[in-house]
Design a protein with these regions (language model features):
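Histidine/acidic-residue-rich catalytic or RNA/ligand-binding cores of hydrolases
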Residues: 341-344, 371-373, 403
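Exposed, interaction-prone extracellular/peripheral surfaces
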Residues: 260, 318-321, 345-348, 352-356, ...
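N-terminal localization/anchoring segments of enzymes in phospholipid and broader phosphate metabolism
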Residues: 1-317, 321, 325, 365, ...
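Catalytic-core elements of nucleic-acid end-processing and repair enzymes
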Residues: 399
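Active-site donor-binding acidic/aromatic loop of nucleotide-activated sugar
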Residues: 388-392
Length: 479
């Protein structure tokens, strides 16, 4: 006599296996056909093979490529670029630095990033001085304030900034604010509602209603941009939160941020207005947001953005070119060091060619997993002659790079797959000896608070530490 229960169970099991393995094989096929970085492809395949259920869920939420998605139509994009392009064409012929003309052209061709001369640059390395300057400039606003931050906290600093924005909105100043929905998950809605009630236009970037059930959580706006009246701008690594001023019980919070004055602010304005279109579907192109600006200084600068929705990885490509260009030195301090193969090979090549390449990382990081992954790359860098330092005075959150007393960049971009592949980022690239010398001195001052890592000693770290680093490195493209 047939056991129908057994047969039904067998059919259900076979059907489940077919669907289960079909989903895994289908997902692996999609990953392979996507023609992405082989390292990232293998990382996803390993996750799917050894952690199939978790791997399927993670790939659905975090792994799908968005590079074919278009945020804004070409016609609208050209309309938005019309004013800064006119300003660029109207300026006297820029004398491009001989050593970085190709880098400037790269950013123009891939990012529509116009180089503007006649700018003034002010550098901040502590949160207090940056916030004080920001509050002063906000108080001077008479026409508009445009602001976007990854984190806009409901704390003493956030409330000070909020109150100024509300006051300005009541005075008739146009105020627009973008905050990242994931970066501000824990901030109560009432904090933003108070601004809206005062007339501030507030939008969240890629709102995530159910964080664990949407791939939007993977694509975050990590930019920190402020534009005031189209004349003054801020960009860098600092968010609006008290900890950027206060630091921790065990040390200071060390970061780098810029105040910019001059035509280069048009680049920040364009970046913000593109993001505003993304969150509000309102295209703002009026010339009053791009006022005629007098010469404020001597710096030549570009504002370069990167996002997960275009064909190019603009800032990563620029970083590779910036590393291989110097003849004397290249200093860099990122929060994380999970480099793509192109970036790592560029650093090794420069060091082997005799360039003084220095890498500075935080001794204590905010993410242990990412810190382990960062450490897994250091042996290869050290072997090629890269000098590695761990900053011990506090928490190093800075994203600064300087080379040959000619080029420097500050922004939101880390040296990791997330910044290069998934985040919306922005950096100011400055071609100016005075600024580069200042950045170099900042780096060297930080170096005095560091412990240097030597290859021979680094190889002696415990085997279990090496094993942990190696395991995390397998997942580096996914972090």
């Amino acid at each position: 006599m047939l056991d129908w229960n057994f047969i039904a169970g067998l059919i259900a099991t076979v059907a489940f296996d077919i669907i289960y393995f079909g989903a895994i094989i289908g997902t692996i096929t999609v990953i392979i056909l996507d023609n992405r970085n082989p390292v990232k492809t293998m990382a996803w395949i390993l996750v799917l093979m050894f952690l199939p259920v978790v791997g399927l869920v993670f790939y659905f939420f975090f792994g799908r490529s968005q590079r074919r998605v278009r945020v804004i139509g070409k016609k609208s994009y050209n309309r938005l670029l019309k004013k800064p392009m006119a300003e660029y064409l109207a300026q006297d012929s820029c004398a491009l630095p001989a050593n970085y003309g190709r880098l400037i052209s790269l950013f123009r061709n891939t990012n529509q990033a116009f180089p503007f001369d006649g700018n003034r640059v002010e550098v901040y390395t502590r949160g207090l001085s940056m916030i004080q300057s920001l509050l002063r400039e906000l108080q001077k606003a008479t026409r508009h304030i445009h602001m976007e931050f990854y984190i806009f906290e409901d704390d003493a600093v956030g409330r000070m900034v909020r109150d100024v924005l509300m006051e300005k909105a009541k005075q008739g100043v146009e105020v627009r604010v973008i905050y990242d929905d994931v970066g501000c998950w824990h901030v109560p809605n009432r904090f933003y509602e108070q601004m809206r009630e005062a007339g501030v236009e507030v939008r969240s970037f890629l709102k995530v209603r159910f964080p664990l059930f949407t791939s939007k959580v993977n694509y975050r706006n990590h930019r920190k941009i402020v534009v005031i009246d189209g004349r003054v701008g801020f960009v860098g690594g600092m968010n609006l939160a008290e900890r950027y001023m206060r630091g921790f019980s065990w040390g200071i919070w060390r970061d780098t941020h810029l105040l910019l004055e001059g035509k280069v602010v048009h680049g920040l304005q364009t970046a913000f207005l593109l993001d505003w279109y993304f969150v509000d579907r309102t295209l703002i192109t009026s010339a009053r947001y791009f006022p005629k600006v007098d010469v404020c200084g001597t710096s030549l600068a570009q504002i370069v953005t990167a996002e997960p929705i275009g064909p190019w990885k603009e800032i990563m490509q620029g970083l590779v070119m910036a590393i291989t260009g110097p003849r004397k030195y290249f200093y860099i301090q990122p929060l994380y060091f999970l480099p793509t193969e192109a970036v790592l090979v560029a650093m090794q090549t420069a060091a082997l060619a005799g360039v003084d390449v220095r890498l500075m990382l935080p001794y204590r990081a905010d993410n242990r997993l990412t810190h382990l992954g960062s450490c897994s790359y250091l042996a290869e860098a050290l072997r090629a002659g890269v000098k590695v330092y761990f900053y011990k005075k506090g928490f190093l959150h800075s994203k600064l790079m300087v080379s040959d007393d000619e080029l420097s960049t500050v922004g939101s971009t880390n040296v990791d797959f997330r910044s290069f592949e998934h985040n919306f980022e922005v950096n100011a690239f400055i071609y100016d000896t005075e600024t580069a010398l200042q950045m170099r001195e900042i780096f060297l001052q930080d170096q005095r608070e560091c412990v240097q890592v030597f290859s021979k000693n680094w190889e002696k770290r415990p085997w279990h530490r090496k094993a942990a680093e190696s395991i995390v490195r397998l997942l580096a493209p996914l972090l």
